[in-house]
Amino acid sequence: LSCSFIINYTLNNNNTIRSHNFAYENGLSSVDLKKYKITNPDNILPKLNEISTLQLAQEEWLRLDGAEAAYPVYSAYANACYDGIAKYQYNRNTLQWHEQDKINAEFEKYIAFNNTVYAFTDLINKNCDIFFGAMPSKQQQLEAAALGEELVLTPIAKEAFVFFVNSTNPVNNLTTQQIKDIYNGKTKNWQPLGGDDRRILAFQRPEGSGSQTLLQHIMGDTPIIE
C-alpha cells in the first residue's frame, strides 16, 4: 500500500454517511476544491510546458485519494500523466447535466477526494491505490497492521504546519512551547501571551486528519485537551 507523505454525501462500504460537516465537497472539505478539479475547464492546476515523459494509459491509471491540502498535488499529477484524462473535462457547449453526473462518477474512481480519514480507510481496504497526505496517525498504523497491510511511506514534499489566530487578535508570534501549553489546557487566556483578556478557543481538526496527526506529533507525550 502506498502513501505519498506530505505534510450529495458519500457513502462508505457499510452505508454510513461520510462527512465532517464542512461547507464543500459534500461535507468533506473546508475549502472549495472546484478550481483544482480536472473536470473544470477553468482549473488553475499547474501545467507542464511539454508533455510529461510519464504517460499512463487508462488501464494503468491508479486510483488516487488523499487530504484536502494534497488534492491540488495529485490532481495536477493525474492531469499531466494520465493519458486521455482531458476527456473528463466539461464542455459547456455540448454537455448536459445528466452527462456531467455520469462523467463525475467515472472520473472519481481515479481522482477521488474523501479527505484524510476516509481516504486512508479506503487505502487499507484496497479501494484506492495511492493516498496523498501527511503521516498516518498511530491509530491508522494499527488499523493497517490489523488488516495485515504494510504501509510504504514515500516523502515527496515538505510543508509548514501553521497556526492562525483571529484577524482582530494582536498576538502574532508564539513559541512551540506556548502552543503546547494552549493545547494541553495550561494556558487558557490570551493575556499572558500579549493578547486581550479573553478565553482561548483552540480549534482542532477531526481525529485521524492530517492536521490533527501533526498536532499530536508536535505535542508528543503532552495530553491534548478535548
Enumerate the language-model features and the residues they cover:
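Flexible loop/hinge segments at secondary-structure junctions
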Residues: 3-226
